[in-house]
């Protein structure tokens, strides 16, 4: 499909909010043995559970490598789940897939951001990453969507949350990190976000969740639930390393107005744990130079904020934690018109993320 030389904003396109109607959700089948334990088999089982949970509400497309295609196809043998073959380096389609944008005339296009595995050779999580860099373009080709390419600008989809009405929330920890776009300052990065997402206001939270190996992705920490309202990971424990991060974010949100001039309504979501991998879980991960080391002493960045909104549903992680029930109740109260489905999130978390990181929604065309 055609790669355009303009920007979504110039062409009348914008990134819609996650609660906008969707045609499908994209996923990628996990298999990387230096990230997922036991050759990825427990993570694959978790992906089957996730795909089937989403498929109750809308179609799912799962991309699998040639070597895993038949295995994935057999395990995902369900009418609402399509399996396609796309070579990849890992399963984080939120960060490697396209950011879909829409206009008011029923068209859907996609933004193909630069990708460097969360930092390249300065703190990145694996190398090479060339197949992941190509994944967004292949998805857009399959969907016959025209493509915008941000040549020389690195961004992961997990580092942004939009309200669809002109505001994006992100973190300084990630977007201003020297290992993403060191040649650009804050103002230049904001200009790219305005052009590619068609937003007017960029809300900068200082940091994401403690020990998030993506350098503080906002989708693990603070997300939009409706225009003017966000859900923020929260702890009242002053000894928790997340305490300062949560309170700093709250200060920004309390003193910021969105693109429509609204004050933010902030809902608090408890943080599970602290959660740690067991020695046995860590031992199941292949040790490869340049890949993220797994260590039972390192706290996992578990978060209930890492959920996905689908048509009529909320797909959220549970952690066999005392806070699971409270998290479910909070989501049910915030989303009264959605069915809250919680699925076990531990295997996904052991790989470095969760449900939102491992999914990418494709918005439905809109005609006004």
From Swiss-Prot:
Question: Known HAMAP family for this protein?
Answer: Agmatine_deimin (MF_01841)
Q: Where is the active site?
A: 357 (amidino-cysteine intermediate)
According to UniProt, the reaction catalysed is: agmatine + H2O = N-carbamoylputrescine + NH4(+)
* Record function comment: Mediates the hydrolysis of agmatine into N-carbamoylputrescine in the arginine decarboxylase (ADC) pathway of putrescine biosynthesis, a basic polyamine.
In the UniProt record, the gene name given for this protein reads aguA
Q: What is the lineage of its organism?
A: Bacteria, Pseudomonadati, Pseudomonadota, Gammaproteobacteria, Pseudomonadales
Q: Which organism is it from?
A: Pseudomonas putida (strain GB-1)
InterPro entries, from UniProt?
Answer: Agmatine_deiminase (IPR017754), Peptidyl-Arg-deiminase_porph (IPR007466)
> Does this entry carry the keyword Hydrolase?
yes
Q: What is its EC number?
A: 3.5.3.12
- What's in the keyword line of the UniProt record? Hydrolase, Polyamine biosynthesis
Enzyme class label: hydrolase
Q: PANTHER family in the record, alphabetically?
A: AGMATINE DEIMINASE-RELATED
Q: What is the official name of this protein in its record?
A: Agmatine deiminase
Which pathway does the protein contribute to? Amine and polyamine biosynthesis; putrescine biosynthesis via agmatine pathway; N-carbamoylputrescine from agmatine: step 1/1
RNA-binding as a keyword of this entry, yes or no, is no
Spell out the family assignment given in the record's similarity comment: Belongs to the agmatine deiminase family.
């Amino acid at each position: 499909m055609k790669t355009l030389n303009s920007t979504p904003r110039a062409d009348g396109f914008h990134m819609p909010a996650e609660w906008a109607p969707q045609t499908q959700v994209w996923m990628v089948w996990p298999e990387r043995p230096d990230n997922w334990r036991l050759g990825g088999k427990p993570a694959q089982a978790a992906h089957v559970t996730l795909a089937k949970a989403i498929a109750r509400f809308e179609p799912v497309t799962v991309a699998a490598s040639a070597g895993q295609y038949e295995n994935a196809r057999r395990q995902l043998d369900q009418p609402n789940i399509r399996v396609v073959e796309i070579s990849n380096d890992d399963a984080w389609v939120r960060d490697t897939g396209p950011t879909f944008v829409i206009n008011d005339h029923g068209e859907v296009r996609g933004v193909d951001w630069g990708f460097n595995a969360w930092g390249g050779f300065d703190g990145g999580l694996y190398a090479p990453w060339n197949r992941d860099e190509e994944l967004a373009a292949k998805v857009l080709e399959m969907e016959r969507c025209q493509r915008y390419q941000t040549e020389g600008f690195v961004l992961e989809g997990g580092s942004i949350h939009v309200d669809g009405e002109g505001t994006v929330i992100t973190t300084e920890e990630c977007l201003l990190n020297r290992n993403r776009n060191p040649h650009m300052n804050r103002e230049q990065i904001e200009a790219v976000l305005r052009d590619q997402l068609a937003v007017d206001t960029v809300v900068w939270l200082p940091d994401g969740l403690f020990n998030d190996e993506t350098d503080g992705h906002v989708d693990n920490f603070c997300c939009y639930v409706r225009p003017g309202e966000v859900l923020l990971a929260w702890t009242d424990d002053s000894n928790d390393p997340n305490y300062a991060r949560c309170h700093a974010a709250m200060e920004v949100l309390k003193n910021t107005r969105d693109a429509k001039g609204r004050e933010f309504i902030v809902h608090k979501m408890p943080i599970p744990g602290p959660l740690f991998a067991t020695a046995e879980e860590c031992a199941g991960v292949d040790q490869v130079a340049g890949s993220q080391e797994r260590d039972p002493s390192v706290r996992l960045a578990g978060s209930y904020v890492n959920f996905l909104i689908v048509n009529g549903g909320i797909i959220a992680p549970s952690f066999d934690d005392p806070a699971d029930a409270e998290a479910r109740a909070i989501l049910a109260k915030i989303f009264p018109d959605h069915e809250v489905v919680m699925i076990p999130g531990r295997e996904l978390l052991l790989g470095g993320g969760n449900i939102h990181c491992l999914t990418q929604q494709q918005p439905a065309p809109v005609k006004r």
